[in-house]
Amino acid sequence: MLAALLGCVALLLVASVGAIALADRRLATTAIYGVALTASVAGLLLALAALLAPAPVPATLALPIGLPWLGAHFRLDALSAFFLVVANLGGAAASLYGLGYGRHEEAPARVLPFFPAFLAAMNLVLVADDAFSFLFSWEFMSLTSWALVMAHHRRSGNAAAGYLYLLMASFGTLALILAFGLLAGWSGAYDFAAIRTASPSALMGAAVLALALAGAGSKAGVVPLHVWLPLAHPAAPSHVSALMSGVMTKVAVYGFVRITFDLVGAPLWWWGALVALTGGITAVMGVLHALMEHDLKRLLAYHTVENIGIIFIGLGLALAFSANEMPAAAALALTAALFHVFNHSVFKSLLFFGAGAVLTATGERDMERLGGLIHRMPRTAFLFLVGSAAISALPPFNGFVSEWLTFQAILLSPALPQWLLKFLVPAIGALLALSAALAAACFVKAFGVTFLGRARSQVAREALETDRCSLGAMFTLAALCLVAGVLPAWFIDALAPVAQALTGSHLPERHGLDWLTIVPIAQSRSSYNGLLLFVLIAFAAALAAAAIHRFASDRVRRAPAWDCGFPDPSPATQYTAGSFSQPIRRVFGTVVFRAREEVEMPAPGATQSARLHVQLRDVLWDTLYVPAARAVALAADHLNAVQFLTIRAYLTLVFGALVALLAVLAIWQ
């Protein structure tokens, strides 16, 4: 099975090379996305088989490629199988979407060669079983995604977004190189099998955890390493944005889980506190920034930050429970985090596909220039509404279940022995609740301003529904949002081998009909029946519709409800995206955004319009990145003098560096 998965990867790489040779645009689009769809579906089926029917011993494969003394090692276990399901499901949906969306692509020659290579790179990361193969695949993933971000580099701001992403990706890779270097130095080998058998010291483990959090967190979008997401995601084509947000960030989560739960060994309790607190801050900061956005794709990018924070809350709780030898609670927290990995991959891809359909139909990402699209694009509007409900954690959709499971894990915090965790975990729960409420408010704004009301521009009035392939991909993901929310037990059962392997336990047996009800700990505490809730919601909706039909007047008359003296008010008088975010901006603006509002009022009696100017700044960008950039520029100016030294001075520098290196090696030994 592992060899077959690598065969799918090889097929994707062949398609990547073949895209360069195909000159006809339409043929190339159909062929490349068709091959990518075929390979992704095959990889999805193989990964599902490995996850649902796990082998007694994980499959391994060693190939004589890469470093001569190491080769390339690959491994397929329950953890990699689950993430392969996520990666190939997202790849299949993006490939199907690309069959239609790709026909409108402005620069297919800069997208088609790198799209299948990007899919192949993510698959390789998930099956790599040695440090060199992992890092090579990780960097391959970074470079192919960077090339896709730079596909439209001539547009304003896209080149800067691409270079910032490359900088953050390089920082993350450097951190992972150091992490694997420490693990390899301790174990004496680079393959993961040898690293697993060596138990690092507490200090070494803490250093590896910090480096893994920095390396994987920069790719996932953990605050304060999130700054590239709101720039790179809008710059990339929409189906690539869906892959980067829905899949690539999950590959980063996989890297963190693989290192901290599998390779490092037994955790310490404060590791969980650090990771969970980082997740809570990430969730709140992400959703606050999303609320301020008017750009639809930037808004979705910030919500990726929020949901990555939710995932890291679950991972942090799992580490804390594992350190305190509470395997059942650790399994619950880990299951919640991994289920949210799957859920976010599904509904975030759906939302980016919807944003791409709007962008294709109107050429606009600014919500202030949209509106009324539900009349022109009813199917896209309905599917975007499903994704909005799912990401807002509304039942009966999948986002509710994984966040509910996370809250159930938080409610177990009184059993933790450390007094700091007894206070910290409920505070993190409050941050999670705040982020969930703000997410719902944000998507009321996103859906309402984009699809409801009246069109605010001519392009919105003339928009047309998107193509069938794009709609097919969106309908598939929308159906998964509903199925995973109504029947979550099927998906939770599939995660049992992963939780068992990493925590030594899995969720307890559920009460009654296990395909109907999930019970995280005990029925007396809490349980959830998605199917029953769905039936009740459907019955209530049908009852309300019947009552309206029975008692409403049969006479239909279309007229303005009340024009308040204005015969035909402009669409500009509607509620705007800025109007929705103003209350939140005034509460958090000074601290989080350094917000400034300026009002230009015309003179008394003048007929000019008043103008409101709002300036928002990212505090983390101004506090961390701007000073760092200035320091680097200053250091570069001073080091510029090194270019003009004599040969004697250069030899002196080389000799000094050699002496310093030998001294470090002597101290290390």
Set out the residue ranges of the language-model regions.
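Hydrophobic core segments of alpha-helical transmembrane domains in multi-pass membrane transport
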Residues: 15-16, 42-44, 90, 180, ...
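Hydrophobic alpha-helical membrane-insertion segments
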Residues: 35-51, 172-178, 384-396, 473-496
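Membrane-interface helix-loop-helix modules in multi-pass inner-membrane proteins
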Residues: 58-84, 131-149, 216, 401
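Membrane-interfacial helical/loop segments at transmembrane boundaries in membrane proteins
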Residues: 59-68, 191-197, 405-418, 491-523
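Aromatic-capped, Gly/Pro-kinked transmembrane alpha-helices
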Residues: 491-539, 546-669
